[in-house]
């Protein structure tokens, strides 16, 4: 049966001689149209298939499209009666496999292989696809560049480099110059002319006049933004004052405050509009104060409430603008911009050096990566040379049409490359996409390219260009399309998202489901009220999951009908029809565990935290102790693993043999005893030494495989739950080790640190979970992974969790396609503070809007995956003194003229903030239904319903142990014993186990871990901490890592600077009596390879010298043998000593740690601990007090350990605050 196309689809298929942009909404059949256009051009226009260039976003999409075209050609061939036409079709079928229907990377590779001589590269290159190898080459290139600058004889060049790194040295968010250079690389490689783009980074900081108001940055970016913001505020204020009858006594008392604020606001706006000097504008904005209190008045309560909102909005706007753009005077702004120009120029210079060195290393190895392919192809097609002319002419004459799928996801470089393939004056470009589904900003996709063409091609006078909109949705049921339109009508506008959704983006229901079928007719907002819910992070709690599991169980129990396109009939929904979409995969492991607990089958599409999986934690710990066995935490992790099976009591017994030495030393001492446990210790130590010897003469990959073989660890993990996946994970680590070695790296320690960096940078090496495990299971995936897919029933989960975009707009820099914003330390009034440049303030705002726009588009993708039923799940946190009705009232008021204002959208902190106003408004206006989960039934009327989940009444059902017992009445004796044990375990899991708290922590704790869990210490004990808080610090659930990263890498964070400072003070030689030897001590550590040159150059040597020259340290020179530094200790404590709400448990917890230093005076011990925490000089006394409270519990642990060791009593405890040069006593 012939397909019936809509008029717009027919135009897209049949139009010729024009550049076409097809804006195809979700589920609108764009792929079918693209395939049909190709077939028509072959059949009707007699184009050869190899005369078409079809660019897709993924290899899977390219393969699918090629297969569809091939199938259609085969169908036409079977029907064809004309011999010549049949021959033509056979030829096209023969050529389809070599036709360029591919990703843009594959096409670029074709360009390079065909015209490599145009840019003089070796044709015998290979493609570097392994992320590990790419990261290794980047590391090497960056290290070479850094060393080159540090050793450069050109002092000016060296100074520029050091100034760049110094600008980021004190960043508390660990954003370093290295981070900037690596981030710059990603942005630069997505630009058509990256050298020119980098060289323009300093442009916004360069002023040609004496007032920042005259700069291009102010006039083109900042001023329009401020005018818009204050215009909106003035409109609100004017409307409010017009509403008030100030002649009436009830309103009269409010008039002076409003009039004064309106007058001062008008003065500032006029000053802004007429470009008054910066300092004058600053003065007028500071005068915009809203004085007076708006007291509640029942007679005019609505006015007072609205007035309060306008007042708060005005105060907040004035505060934000003043502290952002006007925080410093014109003179200081000029100085900041001048320094910013120097840093930006240095960043561009060093970045270009890094790119050149990275390219040199790749060329030396005769390899290219993906970014090379696009850059080199662009270079081939754009150079002013005869060879480039030849390349352009070849492709421009070959391709009669250029088709680009998912055009909204292209970047500037890809778009520039595509434009070079067009012949001047020839309109043969066909682009299809949907800007509402542009969700790959992190890959440098630029939706602005689509929006610009959308606007241009939509104009009546756009000769040779045409815009076509696909609005019909053939995927989703009417309740789904109605809900999507309801939400996005208020969200996507020209000033937020680049498209007017109400006018041009709405979905038109066209799915054609049988109206007689009893299908689900409602989209659900599934919620529970929770005054204790947290929305501060992305972690899902059990309440969220119980709510979703309960709803899934009811869908299955009710046999909710869905339409099955394979049979053309309705059938009951199954688990396999359901998908759960989340913003990130952070909670995947927790979700899987909870679904398993309730017996609901779940297939996880991808699991984060590869390096945190049990098997990788054990093996990486083993590698660490092979490199250096004197590391307590990895050593204990290996001993407790299934390889050796040492119990907590075994470990405690070993530790007690000598509490003052490392665990490795205690283990060796204990092994000399004549006990069964000692024999096991000897076996372990023998194997460890054997592997250490083996590692000296063998490759890392060989070492790994030898561990697997000698320990049978592959077999052990294969026997565990999800064993095949665990085995694949271990195999993947072996393969990465081989790749690491093939790149020229051999050292085990460096490999351990490389893996640590991969984990830190979230470079996950995990293999995909085996697909055959999916079966009839609920599918869990991220929204990104769901793009292009569809499911009968979709749950969108985690709507109350905060976005984490703050990490992109805080710190020392903000980076965007439009430029680089910088923040750095600058001296103000004889004190140094971190200050934002104007460019940084502006880019924070611009980038925040881009990020929020992408989050809104991500929601659009999520909601449009649903075919027949959409369920939005949220755990709603109720503000203090507010019930749900009050919260709904607040949400509904945010909708103005059917839309959220830009100001409100810029305040959004979580997905629910985007959705709730429209949903609440719809509930008010349309009086939509409110139901409980238990009241839901199938086939109900309506398009949107709010479903309240009551945890007490609607709790998800756990597997029924009694039913299991009944079904096992005829079990054999052995089977009955197994069942009895399983039932006991089930009882324990439901709270029957008497020592449940003990299972949530370990019998072996590091002070550093306990310190992270402690809040402020209570007066008479260590801390008022809760056992539940320690779950996040449980070493068997979290990555094990004790090695400081700085030893063999150049990435420098505040924490690493602190650790390095400790290292210097540990090895400083007081015995020589030289108080000026800090420099020589640091030089010695660098020479021995214990400290990198880069980090050494960033240490605060003045602070270190201050301490060793202080009166506090004078005794260290006189009797250095009484000084103890980096002293290991261990002590046994009752759990209740550490955790306030720990249940009664007879066992103990072994706590270990390292004391920075103590000095044995005549009558007792002086204990001290170095701290490098930043201390605000303006609030130094308050900051020091907070530090004392913060570290009091830690020092008391050290005191207790020393007192129990039989040494002299601890007399005093001190914090050595290096950043502010203070030594303070702690009670």
Curated annotation (Swiss-Prot):
Residues 3-477 form the UvrD-like helicase ATP-binding domain. Its cofactor is Mg(2+). Keywords: ATP-binding, DNA damage, DNA repair, DNA-binding, Exonuclease, Helicase, Hydrolase, Isomerase, Nuclease, Nucleotide-binding. Pfam families: PDDEXK_1 (PF12705), UvrD-helicase (PF00580), UvrD_C (PF13361). Residues 505-788 form the UvrD-like helicase C-terminal domain. ATP binds at residues 24-31. Signal peptide: none annotated. It catalyses: Couples ATP hydrolysis with the unwinding of duplex DNA by translocating in the 3'-5' direction; ATP + H2O = ADP + phosphate + H(+). Its EC number is 3.1.-.-, 5.6.2.4. GO terms for biological process: double-strand break repair via homologous recombination. Belongs to the helicase family. AddA subfamily. This is ATP-dependent helicase/nuclease subunit A.
């Amino acid at each position: 049966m012939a397909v019936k196309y809509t008029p717009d689809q027919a135009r897209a298929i049949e139009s010729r001689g024009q550049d076409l942009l097809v804006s195809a909404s979700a589920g609108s059949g764009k792929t079918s149209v693209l395939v049909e256009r190709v077939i028509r051009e072959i059949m009707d226009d007699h184009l050869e298939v190899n005369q078409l260039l079809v660019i897709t976003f993924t290899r899977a999409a390219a393969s699918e499209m090629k297969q569809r075209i091939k199938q259609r050609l085969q169908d036409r061939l079977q029907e064809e009666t004309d011999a010549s036409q049949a021959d033509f079709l056979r030829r096209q079928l023969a050529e389809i496999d070599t036709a360029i229907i591919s990703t843009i990377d594959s096409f670029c590779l074709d360009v390079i292989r065909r015209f490599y001589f145009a840019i003089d590269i070796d044709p015998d290159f290979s493609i570097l696809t392994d992320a590990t190898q790419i990261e290794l080459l980047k590391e090497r290139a960056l290290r070479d560049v850094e060393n080159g600058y540090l050793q450069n004889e050109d002092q000016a060049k060296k100074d520029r480099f050091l100034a760049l790194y110094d600008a980021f040295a004190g960043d508390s968010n660990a954003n370093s110059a290295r981070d900037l250079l690596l981030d710059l690389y990603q942005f630069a490689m997505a630009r058509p002319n990256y050298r020119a783009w980098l060289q323009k980074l300093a442009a916004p900081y360069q002023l040609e006049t004496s007032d920042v108001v005259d700069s291009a940055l102010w006039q083109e970016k900042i001023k329009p933004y401020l005018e818009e913001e204050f215009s909106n505020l003035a409109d609100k204020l004017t409307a409010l004052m017009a509403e008030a009858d100030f002649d009436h006594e009830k309103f009269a008392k409010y008039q002076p405050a409003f009039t004064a604020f309106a007058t001062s606001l008008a003065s500032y706006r006029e000053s802004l509009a007429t470009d008054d000097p910066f300092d004058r504008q600053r003065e007028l904005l500071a005068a915009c104060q809203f004085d007076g209190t708006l007291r509640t008045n029942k007679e005019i309560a609505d006015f007072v409430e609205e007035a309060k909102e306008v007042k708060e909005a005005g105060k907040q706007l004035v505060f934000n603008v003043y502290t952002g753009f006007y925080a410093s005077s014109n003179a200081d702004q000029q100085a900041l911009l001048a320094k910013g120009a120097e840093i930006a120029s240095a960043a561009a210079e060093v970045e270009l050096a890094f790119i050149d060195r990275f390219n040199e290393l790749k060329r030396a190895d005769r390899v290219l990566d993906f970014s090379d392919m696009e850059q080199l192809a662009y270079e081939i097609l754009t150079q002013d040379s005869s060879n480039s002319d030849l390349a352009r002419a070849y492709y421009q004459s070959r391709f009669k049409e250029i088709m680009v799928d998912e055009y909204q996801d292209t970047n500037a470089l890809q778009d520039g490359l595509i434009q070079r393939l067009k012949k001047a004056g020839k309109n043969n470009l066909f682009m299809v996409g949907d800007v509402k589904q542009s969700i790959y900003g992190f890959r440098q996709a630029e939706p602005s390219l689509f929006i610009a063409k959308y606007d241009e091609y939509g104009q009546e006078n756009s000769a040779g260009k045409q815009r076509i909109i696909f609005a019909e949705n053939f995927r989703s049921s009417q309740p789904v399309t109605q809900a999507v339109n309801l939400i996005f009508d208020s969200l996507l506008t020209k000033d937020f998202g680049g498209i007017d959704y109400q006018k041009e983006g709405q979905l038109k229901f066209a799915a054609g489901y049988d109206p007689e079928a009893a299908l689900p007719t409602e989209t659900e907002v599934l919620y529970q009220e929770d005054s204790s819910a947290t929305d501060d992070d992305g972690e899902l709690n059990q309440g969220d999951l119980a709510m979703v599991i309960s709803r899934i169980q009811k869908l299955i129990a009710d046999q909710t009908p869905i339409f099955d396109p394979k049979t053309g009939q309705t059938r009951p929904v199954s688990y396999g029809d359901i998908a759960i979409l989340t913003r990130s995969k952070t909670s995947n492991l927790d979700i899987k565990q909870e679904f398993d607990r309730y017996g609901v089958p779940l297939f996880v599409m991808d699991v984060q935290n590869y390096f945190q999986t049990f098997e990788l934690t054990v093996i990486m710990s083993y590698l660490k102790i092979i490199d250096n066995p004197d590391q307590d935490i990895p050593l204990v992790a290996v001993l407790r693993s299934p390889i050796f099976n040492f119990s907590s009591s075994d470990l405690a017994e070993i530790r007690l043999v000598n509490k003052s030495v490392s665990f490795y030393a205690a283990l060796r001492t204990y092994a000399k005893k004549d006990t069964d446990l000692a024999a096991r210790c000897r076996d372990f130590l023998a194997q460890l030494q054997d592997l250490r010897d083996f590692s000296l003469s063998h490759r890392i990959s060989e070492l790994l495989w030898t561990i697997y073989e000698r320990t049978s660890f592959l077999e052990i993990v294969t026997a565990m739950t999800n064993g095949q996946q665990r085995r694949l994970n271990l195999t993947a680590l072996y393969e990465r080790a081989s790749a690491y070695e093939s790149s020229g790296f051999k050292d085990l320690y460096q490999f351990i640190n490389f893996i640590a960096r991969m984990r830190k940078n979230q470079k996950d090496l995990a293999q995909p979970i085996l697909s055959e495990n999916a079966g009839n299971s609920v599918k869990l995936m991220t929204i990104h992974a769901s793009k292009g897919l569809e499911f009968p029933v979709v749950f969108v989960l985690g709507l109350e969790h905060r976005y984490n975009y703050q990490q992109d707009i805080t710190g020392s820099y903000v980076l965007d396609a439009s430029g680089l914003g910088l923040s750095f330390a600058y001296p103000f009034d004889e004190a140094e503070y971190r200050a934002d440049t104007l460019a940084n303030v502006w880019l924070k705002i611009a980038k925040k809007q881009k990020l929020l726009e992408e989050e809104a588009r991500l929601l659009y993708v999520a909601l449009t995956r649903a075919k027949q039923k959409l369920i939005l799940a949220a755990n709603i946190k109720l503000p203090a003194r507010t019930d749900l009705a009050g919260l709904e009232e607040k949400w509904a008021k945010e909708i103005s003229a059917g839309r959220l204002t830009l100001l409100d959208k810029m305040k959004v902190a979580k997905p629910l903030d985007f959705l709730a106003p429209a949903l609440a408004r719809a509930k008010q206006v349309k009086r939509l239904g409110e139901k409980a989960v238990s009241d839901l039934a199938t086939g109900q009327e309506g398009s949107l319903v709010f479903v309240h989940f009551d945890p007490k009444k609607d709790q998800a059902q756990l597997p029924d142990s009694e039913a299991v017992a009944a079904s096992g009445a005829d079990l054999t004796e052995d089977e009955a014993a197994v069942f009895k044990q399983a039932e006991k375990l089930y009882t324990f899991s439901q709270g029957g186990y008497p020592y449940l708290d003990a299972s949530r922590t370990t019998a072996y704790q590091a002070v550093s871990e306990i310190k992270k869990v402690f809040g402020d210490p209570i007066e008479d004990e260590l801390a008022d901490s809760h056992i539940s808080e320690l779950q996040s610090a449980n070493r068997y659930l979290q990555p094990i890592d004790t090695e400081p990263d700085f030893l063999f890498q150049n990435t420098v964070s505040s924490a690493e600077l602190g650790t390095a400072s400790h290292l210097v003070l540990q090895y400083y030689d007081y015995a020589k009596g030289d108080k000026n030897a800090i420099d020589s001590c640091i030089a010695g550590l660098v020479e021995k390879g214990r400290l990198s040159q880069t980090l050494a150059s960033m240490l605060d040597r003045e602070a270190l010298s201050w301490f060793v020259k202080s009166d506090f340290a004078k005794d260290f020179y006189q009797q250095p043998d009484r000084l103890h530094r980096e002293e290991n200790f261990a002590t046994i404590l009752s759990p209740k000593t550490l955790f306030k709400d720990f249940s009664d448990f007879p066992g103990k917890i072994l706590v270990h740690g390292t004391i920075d230093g103590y000095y044995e005076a005549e009558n007792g011990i002086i204990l001290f601990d170095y701290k490098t925490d930043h201390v605000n000089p303006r609030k130094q006394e308050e900051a020091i007090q907070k530090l004392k409270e913060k570290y009091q519990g830690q020092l008391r642990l050290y005191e207790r350990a020393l007192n129990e060791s039989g040494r002299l009593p601890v007399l005093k405890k001190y914090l050595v605050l290096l950043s502010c040069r203070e030594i303070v006593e702690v009670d």
